[in-house]
Amino acid sequence: MARLMIKNALILMLIASSAAAAGTSSINWIQVFPGTSPTPRSYLAMTYDEASQKVILFGGYDGTKHLNDTWIFDGVTWTRVNASIAPPARSAAQIAYDRVTRKVILFGGFNGRQYLGDTWLWDGNTLRWTRTTPVHSPPAVTGPMLFTDPNGHVDEFGGFDGHFYQATMWQWNGSGWSQLYPAQVPYARGLAAVGVNTLRNEAVMFGGLADVNPVNTWTYDGKTWTLQSTRIQPLWVYAGSAVFDPNLRAVVLFGGGSGGMDQNSTWAWTGSQWKQLLASQVPLPREGAGIAYAAALGGTLIFGGQDGNLLLNDTWRLAP
């Protein structure tokens, strides 16, 4: 899937701009062995649903087809939800939890033929999907960035529409999308990693695919984006996985693709700098994995993704 987006991206020499060494801390990744699991896939959509206190996973790509199955994880096992209505099959969509409406919002993606711009709501209490018909919507894109902004709403930024990377920003208002116009926005990109630090009330964005250098770190406080000056930062990656981990008091970034080589390094954004986290055991390198933080389920979890052509369906938990 990432190759579809790399087509128009200028990615040469980006890797060289990342620093090699930083202050380090130790963590541990622990593999979880659920009774059942979704089939191997990458570029799935995954988040924590606060309403049901479970992780929700939707769709992805299994190497031959795009998927539209829905799964929930309760900390012990993955369970497939037999929803009578569900979003059409896709990969590289994104989902995020809206604290205002207490719904999970799904937007965008790619189905093998076209870029998608439909919006769906997931109700974790009823286990039902509902399609919305907003008057205004973000452009149809693959690889958008969806995140719960510091005000509790779901925001959407960027993505790739088949011709251009986007730099527009939108917010879900409960019944439709409203375009936002911050004074400054990150350079246009898709497949960046985004996590929201709920202690500092700021979103953190790193990397992605772009026509202009995406090897940079941006923060968003609910009103303004700020480009951070960092002496040390992770290797440039696209389709990395990021989430805020309160145990570490930092946004954690794991894996991602980098110039055709998938990664399995773990980094933490502390609020002012990146710090590499070292572990004695780490998951396989991967891009397009799902990530979510769920304190009730054991902390930060990752699932699936792909290491080169190897599709994965393993589940891991981060232990600080």
Predicted regions, residues:
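Bacterial N-terminal signal peptides
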Residues: 9-18
